[in-house]
């Protein structure tokens, strides 16, 4: 099997960085439903190292984190050659037009405000992962 075929047949890997257990549980449920593999972190201090080592297909990054904020983590990810091109979604309780602009200027590919609908999260993940999800796992979510 070629490397390209191996890549498309593997489940996408998502790195989730969230310090609230209930939010982690919700995100892991959504990712499991989509058929994704995932790594959950509640401490942002090692996010850059984990991203470099595992090369996830997508990162879901809370903004209001202890130790390093999501914006600080994002700056580190964008400076690192091994992680600069990994799509990152800001997952935040901060809502508003000015916040959206701030996140996009910081390099986030998108953002979702808490509380969010699982369907909205799943559509966003599907869009950002393009063809890395198996069609059967996202058929209902991504169908237009």
Question: What label would you give each PLM region?
Answer:
Residues 18:
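Conserved acidic carboxylate
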Residues 54-60, 65:
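Active-site beta3 strand of CheY-like receiver
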Residues 66, 84, 96:
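The feature encodes the CheY-like receiver
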Residues 1-15, 119-144:
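Non-catalytic signal-transmission and effector/linker regions of two-component phosphorelay proteins
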